């Protein structure tokens, strides 16, 4: 999860987030190289004493600086389209969960189980225990199996919300009257925190998300006790 004064992105926990981190680093390197080249050319222009007052145009140069950026943008677009396809792909999910946004809490339903659902509210600051995180702890965590594909169905009952967990590379809008879907897969156990990422009213910042990823055997035991 995030820590104070963090500069980079959170550590990746899912294959999708790994791909997003690689794409981010790849694109950032291209931007850095282009920026360095532009700054170098500007510094040469400011320091040189050579001028070309007789030059009216330069067709070759204009052609190069039109075609080359287009090629770079196409390469970046191809990489991003691949990741977009991977994020939309649903491959034989082990479990399906329905998430509904409300002002200002989340409700969850395990659709593969009968009558397994609950609401998840933020724990007020005055009720936090030592070591718990302010504005991020909830009374009911979402328990999910690790290393398994989970399909999330996300919607809202009132206004626009957005269900986001950064370390898993997830951010899906919760829109009233529309059912969006996404998949998640955590490669290691642990607690993963997120928040509503769409301005949804006065208590928008009090809608945390907590996923607890556990081994499959533990999840089966927990679900049997809850049903």
Curated annotation (Swiss-Prot):
EC number(s) from the headed UniProt entry: 7.1.1.9
One Pfam entry name: COX2
Residue ranges that the Swiss-Prot or TrEMBL entry lists as coiled coil: none
Cofactor note: Binds a dinuclear copper A center per subunit.
GO molecular function terms attached to this record: copper ion binding; cytochrome-c oxidase activity
Chain positions recorded as Cu cation A2 binding sites: 196, 198, 200, 204
Subcellular location: Mitochondrion inner membrane
Regions crossing the membrane: 15-45, 60-87
Signal peptide residues on this chain, from the entry's feature table: none
A GO CC term attached to the entry: mitochondrial inner membrane
Name the record gives this protein: Cytochrome c oxidase subunit 2
Reaction catalysis annotation: 4 Fe(II)-[cytochrome c] + O2 + 8 H(+)(in) = 4 Fe(III)-[cytochrome c] + 2 H2O + 4 H(+)(out)
Major place of residence: mitochondrion
InterPro entries, alphabetized: CcO_II, CcO_II-like_C, CcO_II_C, Copper_CuA, Cupredoxin, Cyt_c_oxidase_su2, Cyt_c_oxidase_su2_TM_dom, Cyt_c_oxidase_su2_TM_sf
Residues that bind Cu cation A1: 161, 196, 200, 207
Function in brief: Component of the cytochrome c oxidase, the last enzyme in the mitochondrial electron transport chain which drives oxidative phosphorylation. The respiratory chain contains 3 multisubunit complexes succinate dehydrogenase (complex II, CII), ubiquinol-cytochrome c oxidoreductase (cytochrome b-c1 complex, complex III, CIII) and cytochrome c oxidase (complex IV, CIV), that cooperate to transfer electrons derived from NADH and succinate to molecular oxygen, creating an electrochemical gradient over the inner membrane that drives transmembrane transport and the ATP synthase.
Family, similarity comment: Belongs to the cytochrome c oxidase subunit 2 family.
Top-level class of the enzyme under EC nomenclature: translocase
Membrane topology, Mitochondrial matrix segments: 46-59
Gene3D superfamilies named in the record: 1.10.287.90, Cupredoxins - blue copper proteins (2.60.40.420)
PROSITE patterns documented for this protein: COX2, COX2_CUA, COX2_TM
Key words, A-Z: Copper, Electron transport, Magnesium, Membrane, Metal-binding, Mitochondrion, Mitochondrion inner membrane, Phosphoprotein, Respiratory chain, Translocase, Transmembrane, Transmembrane helix, Transport
Residues that coordinate or bind Mg(2+): 198
């Amino acid at each position: 999860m995030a820590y104070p004064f963090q500069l980079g992105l959170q550590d990746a926990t899912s294959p999708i987030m790994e791909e997003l981190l690689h794409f981010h680093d790849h694109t950032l390197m291209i931007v850095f190289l282009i920026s360095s080249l532009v700054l170098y050319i500007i510094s040469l222009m400011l320091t040189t004493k050579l001028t070309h007052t007789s030059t009216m145009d330069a067709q070759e140069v204009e052609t190069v600086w039109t075609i080359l950026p287009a090629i770079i943008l196409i390469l970046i677009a191809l990489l991003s389209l691949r990741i977009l396809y991977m994020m939309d792909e649903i491959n034989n999910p082990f479990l399906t969960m329905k998430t509904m946004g409300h002002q200002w809490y989340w409700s969850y339903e395990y659709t593969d189980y009968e009558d397994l659902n609950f609401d998840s509210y933020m724990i007020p600051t005055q009720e936090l225990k030592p070591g718990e995180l302010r504005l991020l702890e909830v009374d009911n965590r979402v328990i999910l199996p690790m290393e398994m594909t989970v399909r999330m169905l996300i919607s809202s009952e009132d206004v626009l919300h957005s269900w986001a967990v950064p370390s898993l590379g997830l951010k899906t809008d919760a829109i009233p009257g529309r059912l969006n879907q996404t998949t998640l897969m955590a490669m290691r156990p642990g607690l993963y925190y997120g928040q509503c990422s769409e301005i949804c009213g006065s208590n928008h910042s009090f809608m945390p998300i907590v996923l607890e990823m556990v081994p499959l055997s533990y999840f089966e035991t927990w679900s049997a006790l809850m049903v």
